[in-house]
Regions:
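Small-aliphatic-rich amphipathic alpha-helix that forms the alpha element of a beta-alpha
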Residues: 37, 102, 112-160
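Short, hinge-like loop/turn segments at secondary-structure boundaries
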Residues: 69-70, 163-166
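Active-site-adjacent structural patch at catalytic or cofactor/ligand-binding sites
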Residues: 92-103
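Short, flexible, mixed-charge acidic loops at enzyme active sites
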Residues: 66-67, 108-113
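Short acidic/glycine-rich loop or secondary-structure boundary segments that cap or lie
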Residues: 61-63, 104-108
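N-terminal amphipathic, basic helical "cap/leader" segment at the start of enzyme domains
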Residues: 1-94, 199-201
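C-terminal helix-cap and adjacent tail motif
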Residues: 4-17, 170-201
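A general secondary-structure junction signal
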Residues: 53-55, 100, 178
Length: 201
């Protein structure tokens, strides 16, 4: 069975070797990314996901200043492997910062007390779907990306530097750009160990 949705999923891979040469305009990328998040479902239609796109100097500042300084103070051994990784991220075109609005999450906890213990989980599920939606949308435009998680180490400085709300919780950083080298075939584990199909009660 041929399915365009699954085909787009198959194009979405973790790509580390990226460059800053893209044919798309920044406005086109903004529309693509923000639309993907807007169309992502969320529990109770809470729409808790927030995003900030870093282009140009803002993208460089994140990786060359904020993340580098933070990790430099934590890594006690050889810093060169980390340095090389950060340089690779900086060479990409941009970064999407994914946040969740905890003020909205808290409001839904109060409005729906029966489900209050679940809203943190609901929020994280919504964010995960938004991240996948953006990642896949970029892949369909032949734009590579890798998902990073330097939170919570960089949260405070990111929010302070760009004057973002304190109640936004940073969950991930999606680095994207043109693909210099595509990864090899993805290893997929056996379905026998992962899935079941049932038809009898």
């Amino acid at each position: 069975m041929s399915n365009s949705f699954l085909k787009s999923f198959k194009t979405r891979r973790t790509v580390y070797e990226l460059s800053n040469q893209l044919s798309q305009e920044q406005g086109q990328l903004e529309e693509l990314i923000f639309s993907a998040i807007e169309l992502t479902p969320s529990a109770f239609n809470s729409q808790t996901s927030r995003a900030v796109i870093l282009f140009g100097d803002a993208h460089l500042y994140l990786w060359q200043k904020i993340v580098r300084k933070t990790l430099r103070s934590l890594v006690t051994g050889d810093f060169s492997p980390t340095e090389n990784k950060l340089k690779a991220f900086a060479q990409a075109y941009g970064t999407v910062l994914f946040f969740e609005d905890m003020q909205v999450v808290d409001r839904f906890k109060k409005d729906y007390p029966t489900y209050a213990p679940n809203f943190i989980s609901f929020s994280e599920q919504s964010s995960g779907m938004a991240q996948l939606a953006v990642w896949t949308a970029l892949a369909t435009e032949s734009i590579g990306a890798s998902l990073q998680h330097y939170n919570p180490l960089i949260d405070d400085e990111v929010k302070a530097h760009w004057k973002l709300p304190a109640y936004w919780k940073l969950l991930s950083q999606l680095v994207f750009g043109s693909i210099k080298s595509f990864p090899g075939e993805k290893e997929i584990r056996s379905r026998i160990a992962r899935f079941h199909t049932l038809s009898e009660a």
